[in-house]
Amino acid sequence: MNRRELLAAAGALGLLSQSTESNAAPVANSSTPALAPTPPMGWNSWNSFATTITEEQAIANAEIMARELKPFGYDIFTIDIQWYEGAAKGYDYNTKPIPTMDEHGRLLPAPNRFPSSVKGAGFKPIADKVHALGLKFGVHLMRGIPRLAVERNLPILGGKWKARDIANTESVCPWNPDMYGVDMSKPGAQDYYNSVFALLASWDIDFVKMDDMSRPYDANAPEIEAAHRAIQASGRPMILSLSPGETPLASGEHVRRHAQMWRISDDFWDEWPQLKAQFTRLENWSMFRQPGRWPDADMLPLGRLQMGKRDCRFTPDEQRTLMTLWSIARSPLIMGGDLRHLDPATLALLTNREVLAVNQASRDNKPAALIEEVRTWTARAEQGETRYLALFNVSDKKESKQVHFDLSRLGLKSVKVRDLWARRDLGTVRGRVSATLAPHASLLYGLTPV
């Protein structure tokens, strides 16, 4: 059984309700947080390389990212799961992995895949290359301590404790065999996490995607807190991204105090039912979103995917709906396709500056009522009087649908309408905005009062 099947089996919890009510209070922080003041944008290797990416493939993608995507704000380059596994084979995991580790049970890049990591260099040489391109560098971590470190009972750096002293062998990931959980009540447990993030800091890591964190949330919360403390102790700012979902809505206050972004669903792939389900999740999480705290609808499975075997299955309308929803809901924008095969249509989808401005520079983003399978979101531009309106036809019927939005809901009477995707002014309307949308299609308008 592969990761996706195991995730689905482990997370058959159902969607949360469609209510967006929350008693959440803003997290106490400065008005402009140092980490992730806007939704993070970047690239991640999972959708295109699974567990198998090599140094050569990584650098090739980073160079293309710097040239084609960085000018539009995509600046976090992340190597996903099992970079420490020399025999990693794809979307399935080896049942008895042999991870590359140091003498203290800390994971190291597999030298057969990342040759620059030898002689203790770790990811520092790749980080240096990525930084030289003007990008930030991120890596993936699994929750816990390697099972092999526990089997060998390796000593924890800087103390008298060993791996077996802190391992919780009852706490295991249901879909990956690499790690045991860490019992944070044990002496030496925080020392281990501190040592891991100190190693990442020595490599100049900027972003950590930490997996197997959100389910079961309450059981794993001590390790979420441990990772947060370890980053603070490392002395290096690192964005902490928690995965997979879905994170329980009831844990929203806790998660946003300890991470900059967190997944609201299982792995998201290019299938319409999954995209349709994200509407409810993003609606539910809207009240917890604020600068430096971002509910994450997952990566953008666009372009060439799954180890080069296929291209994105979404229709052009569905791809635009994906980008429109992620933008108006201010989800992080993390491209997942192999950039070596970046086609003009996908590049255009990712680099529309007017659409990206909605994601990066808007406020008061909120969902409106669901009426006959038409989803509606509105927002304000960060500066000026412009409002944003996104309308979505999520119906699975074949017929197109007439959609309408009464301007009175925004306290407006007459507006100039601009189609942000077409980058074209549509003229002035009074009273309401109307359009015809095909099934699974969407629109994104800028509305300027007149």
Explain the meaning of each model-derived region.
Residues 320, 326-329, 334-336, 370-410:
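Carbohydrate-binding surface patches
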Residues 68-126, 133-194, 198-201, 205-207, ...:
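Aromatic-lined carbohydrate-binding/catalytic grooves of carbohydrate-active enzymes
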Residues 167-171, 184-185, 191, 233-338:
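Glycan-recognition surfaces
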Residues 5-24:
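N-terminal export signals
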Residues 40-45, 75-80, 137-140, 206-211, ...:
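Structural recognition of the beta-strand scaffold that forms the well-ordered cores
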Residues 429-450:
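C-terminal beta-strand-rich structural cap/linker in extracellular carbohydrate-active enzymes
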Residues 324-367:
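Catalytic cores of secreted or luminal carbohydrate-active enzymes
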Residues 18-39:
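C-terminal segment of N-terminal export signals and the immediately downstream linker at the start
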